[in-house]
From Swiss-Prot:
Induction summary: Expression is sigma K-dependent and negatively regulated by GerE.
Membrane spanning stretches: none
GO biological process: sporulation resulting in formation of a cellular spore
InterPro entries in the record: Spore_germ_GerPE
Protein name per Swiss-Prot or TrEMBL: Probable spore germination protein GerPE
Cystine connections: none
Keyword check for ATP-binding: no
Role this protein plays: Required for the formation of functionally normal spores. Could be involved in the establishment of normal spore coat structure and/or permeability, which allows the access of germinants to their receptor.
Ranges in coiled-coil conformation: none
Record bears the keyword RNA-binding: no
Swiss-Prot/TrEMBL keywords: Germination, Sporulation
Organism (species): Bacillus subtilis (strain 168)
Domain of life: Bacteria
Length: 133
């Protein structure tokens, strides 16, 4: 692994999400994993049978992650005349689920995000108040 100094004058970001990494400098391995199940409703209601989660109903949480094949036969050579990484500024809106913002060298980076987002939106007619006749 390359060994260098990372110097950043300014880092500005609004959000660092679940299982995300902000790393300055060299690292051997970064491994991020997150599983998210979210329900969004237009009306705030809660039914008595909610709150339990059955992973068997959602195969996305049970499937094995697809991993890339390992590098084979790739040879490379680097010559760093200045052994430092200089960055004036980094401005990021957000680093999302299982992502990385990294300034430096890394031997291995893995990220796995599984999201199931259910939106229950009612039609505009059903949201309007009932008219009494």
């Amino acid at each position: 692994m390359l060994k260098r100094i990372s110097r950043i004058r300014l880092v500005k970001f609004n959000s660092l999400g679940i299982a995300s990494v902000f790393q300055v400098g060299d690292t051997n391995e970064i491994d991020m994993s997150v599983k998210v199940f979210a329900v969004q409703r237009s009306l705030s209601t809660f039914y008595h049978n909610e709150g339990s989660f059955n992973k068997k109903e959602y195969q996305i949480f049970q499937q094995q992650a697809v991993k890339p094949l390992p590098e084979t036969g790739v040879q490379s050579a680097f010559c760093h005349e200045v052994p430092a990484i200089y960055v004036r500024s980094i401005k990021i809106q957000g680093v999302s689920a299982s992502s990385v913002l990294h300034a430096g060298s890394a031997s291995l980076i893995r990220g796995d995000a599984r999201l199931k987002h259910i939106r229950q939106i009612q039609s505009p007619r059903s949201q309007s108040p009932a008219k009494n006749i």
